[in-house]
């Protein structure tokens, strides 16, 4: 029997209740619902956005209200997978991108609404989902809902809060807003705002009805993961009566955000994988915050730990692999379980390859201070340009002419006050450079999205006086990732490890005992 078949069989057996009698958990069906509803212990189909396939896909996850019966400091793989499903559902739907430029309710939160309904949660509130995806604020969208049950004679309220981590458009530029202090400015600002939103939701719920024992279930993927990681520390301090053992936090593909100085309100179990002298612990310490990280994924390495940044809680690394049997199993999953575009695990980066990419980046940027002073504004505006789309660009595949590019650049956060003729000269030079850059992306089949953004991206870099070769290289990588173009390049292979499907497959394939304290590749 192949490893995957055994794991599936074991999961089905457990889901059917074939546990030792003494270990059986209370069934959700025995509960009385006061708000929302109790649901059977079962697998539920949740939708998620797939940037890899340019589509909305669905996947099945096990859920039970009894997953919250134990202390949050106890790692629970079934709860982790359910959280990943909810975190992915919190992303903007792919279908809603047809209204990319619009402000208002256009279906961005359709997947998380559906997920909450299937799992029996009610009183859904959405924060920041109605912004146009052309906006670039230091915020994050978040979906919150609750259910209040009477289980075993005790009243319990479970509040789910999931932060959007994909499909957020020009908000992407905030991922590069490190700032000059000892914490990532963009992530901290988003976490502080959402703390107030969640506190308001809890207080309003408590006014309507006693909550009983409050349990908070939080999660996020990528940008959503780091904001949820910071939120986890803050809500324990901000919400009276909320015990740490009742705050269940699972994050995925989590960037680092905090240095050791300042911001004590955003720190909890900080850098929990390491001792005070920086050495790796033998095993995880106690925490209610679990960060699940694919060993080859480059995003959790930004900003570099060598610059003094770490996460709250316990980092659990999913292994990369070069083991032939494991690759065969994973590639079978990649062909059958995640949409029309096969996911080839043998092509994804190992931890060593990703480390080499990061080393080259650190050598280029030199230090955190040098990055902030010389590159941060340029990279933020280059990225913002990659994610701005007008109605004509979305619906008619319009490619801006040079005059229109000049006007767009004059709306960017850091270029509003730059001399008109300096911007114009940069755009004209970028038009000339663009043909060579597009050929480096795909000489025969240049995607329309790459054609739309190549001149604006190049022009921004030139406006800031970056070297032409550096501007071309940065633009190439942005174009390849936006256009989902694979290439035999370690940086692209490391970036493609970031796809949500990679995390789902690795979580389902590897047992918790095979999670690692640091990035690892199996052979």
Question: Which residues fall in each region the model found?
Answer:
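Active-site loop->helix "elbow" adjoining a glycine-rich segment at hydrolase catalytic centers
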Residues: 222-227
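C-terminal catalytic-base region of ester-bond hydrolases, centering on the histidine
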Residues: 298-523
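Short, polar loop/linker segments at the starts of domains and inter-domain junctions
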Residues: 100-103, 176-183, 304-311
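C-terminal segment of N-terminal export signals and the immediately downstream linker at the start
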Residues: 1, 21-43
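N-terminal export signals
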Residues: 5-28
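N-terminal low-complexity, Ser/Thr- and acidic-residue-enriched intrinsically disordered segments
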Residues: 33-121
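The feature captures the conserved acid-bearing segment of alpha/beta-hydrolase catalytic domains
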Residues: 248, 253-342
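A conserved cap/lid and substrate-binding interface adjacent to the catalytic center
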Residues: 110-219, 230, 234-251, 264, ...
């Amino acid at each position: 029997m192949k490893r995957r078949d055994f794991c599936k069989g074991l999961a089905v057996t457990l889901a059917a209740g074939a546990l030792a009698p003494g270990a059986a958990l209370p069934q959700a069906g025995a509960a009385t619902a006061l708000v929302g509803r109790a649901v059977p212990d079962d697998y539920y189909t949740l939708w998620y956005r797939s940037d890899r396939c340019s589509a909305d896909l669905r996947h099945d996850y096990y859920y039970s209200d009894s997953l919250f019966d134990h202390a949050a400091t106890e790692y629970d793989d079934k709860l982790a997978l359910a959280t990943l499903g909810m975190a992915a559902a919190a992303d903007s739907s792919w279908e809603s991108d047809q209204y990319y430029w619009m402000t208002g309710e256009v279906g961005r939160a359709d997947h998380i609404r559906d997920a909450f309904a299937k799992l029996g949660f009610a009183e859904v509130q959405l924060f920041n989902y109605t912004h146009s995806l052309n906006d670039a604020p230091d915020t994050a969208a978040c979906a919150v809902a609750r259910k209040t049950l009477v289980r075993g004679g005790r009243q319990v309220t479970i509040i789910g809060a999931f932060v959007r981590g994909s499909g957020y458009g020009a908000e992407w530029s905030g991922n590069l807003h490190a700032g000059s202090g000892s914490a990532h400015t963009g992530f901290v600002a988003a976490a502080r705002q959402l703390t107030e939103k969640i506190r308001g939701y809890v207080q309003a719920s408590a006014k309507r009805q006693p909550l009983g024992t409050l349990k908070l279930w939080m999660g996020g993927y990528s940008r959503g993961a780091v904001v949820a990681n910071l939120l986890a520390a803050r809500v324990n301090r901000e919400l009276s009566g909320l015990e740490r053992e009742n705050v269940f936090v699972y994050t995925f593909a989590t960037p680092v955000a905090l240095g050791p100085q300042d911001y004590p309100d955003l720190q909890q179990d900080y850098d929990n994988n390491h001792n005070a002298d920086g050495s790796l612990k033998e095993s995880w310490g106690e925490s209610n915050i679990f960060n699940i990280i694919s060993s080859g994924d480059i995003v959790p390495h930004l900003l570099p730990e060598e610059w003094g940044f770490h996460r709250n809680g316990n980092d659990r690394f999913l292994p990369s692999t070069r083991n032939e049997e494991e690759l065969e199993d994973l590639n079978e999953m990649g062909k059958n379980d995640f949409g029309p575009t096969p996911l080839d695990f043998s092509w994804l980066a190992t931890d060593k390859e990703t480390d080499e990419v990061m080393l080259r980046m650190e050598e280029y940027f030199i230090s955190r201070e040098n990055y902030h002073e010389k590159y941060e504004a340029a990279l933020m505006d280059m990225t913002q340009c990659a994610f701005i789309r007008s109605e004509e660009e979305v619906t008619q595949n319009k490619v801006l002419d040079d005059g229109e590019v000049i006007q767009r650049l004059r709306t960017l956060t850091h270029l509003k006050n730059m001399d008109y003729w300096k911007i114009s000269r940069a755009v004209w030079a970028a038009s000339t450079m663009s043909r060579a850059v597009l050929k480096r992306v795909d000489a025969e089949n240049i995607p329309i999205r790459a054609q739309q953004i190549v001149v604006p991206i190049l022009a921004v870099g030139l406006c800031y006086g970056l070297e032409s070769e550096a501007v071309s290289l940065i633009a190439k990588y942005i174009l390849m990732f936006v256009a989902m173009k694979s290439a035999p390049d370690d940086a692209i292979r490391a970036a493609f490890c970031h796809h949500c499907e990679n995390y789902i497959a690795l979580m389902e394939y590897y047992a918790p005992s095979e999670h690692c304290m640091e990035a690892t590749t199996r052979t």
